[in-house]
Amino acid sequence: MSYFKTALLLAGLTALFMGVGYLIGGANGALIALVVAAAMNIFTYWNSDRMVLSMYGAQEVDERSAPDLYRMVAELAGRASLPMPRVFIMDNPQPNAFATGRNPENAAVAVTTGLMNQLSREELAGVVAHELAHIKNHDTLLMTITATIAGAISMVAQFGMFFGGNRENNNGPGLIGSLALMILAPLGAMLVQMAISRTREYAADEMGARICGQPMWLASALGRIEAAAHQVPNYDAERSPATAHMFIINPLSGQGMDNLFATHPSTDNRVAALQRLAAEIGGSSYRPASTFSRGAGTAASSGTPRGTGRSPWGGQPRGRGPWG
């Protein structure tokens, strides 16, 4: 189904791209836009993950450069029966994360330095498990392609405003076309974000909670990231708002309630769903990360059997953060 949705979305974005081309250059502009869109669709399918990671200055790490994070991702990927994804770190103070890649065999998980510094080990595991769930559900292809193509449409629309519309007829249609560009660019980006079903976040929350075995780890992380999104700006995301739907929490602003134009479900609703899941499958009770004991030990065995209700580190949350 993900590939079918991707095809429909690409067709819609191509049509929008052609419309923008027509407004700029008439029939010839639409034809050029069609050719460019076809080439861009092919290029995006194979390269969009690298483009998004580069956009955020993400640096790939391995077991030597980031051993704790790398081993955590490896263990959770094993529990999810996924190939080991590439691991990236973004130098950004806002705690957040996203996954990208056209399929599980070519996937990547990217986390910010803010996420690593501000979350406990347990919360970080919940976030990583959520991103792995997106990979397992093949959401990453749709998220990455829509982000890159929506960004391209916005750039073309901005160029059109500078260019001045269809100069073959400046007596009215050119001006109207320019005004239409002002409306279509943000509207197109909004429609792209709306096209990514918000229900996938609930599905990734549930699957991620089952992967790590502790729904409340993710619930605590969501609350902390949501609060930080109001206080710590993500300037890279502000420059590329079409990528906002890729993150676990909207990096632009917190969403107080579900609404037609939201890129993410309400965090309160997501936490409530995770609380219900915790009551169903078991796991630790909810405690905000600020109450965790800083003197507790770090991770124990990685040989915990798979299954619901048990964490990969022995069942009970440990207070020490993942980075000492």
From Swiss-Prot:
Keywords: Cell inner membrane, Cell membrane, Hydrolase, Membrane, Metal-binding, Metalloprotease, Protease, Transmembrane, Transmembrane helix, Zinc. Residues 288-324 are annotated as: Disordered. GO terms for molecular function: metalloendopeptidase activity; zinc ion binding. Binds 1 zinc ion per subunit. It is an enzyme of class 3 (hydrolase). Residues 288-305 have a biased composition (Polar residues). The active site is at E131. One of its GO terms (biological process) is proteolysis. Belongs to the peptidase M48B family. This is Protease HtpX homolog. The gene is htpX.
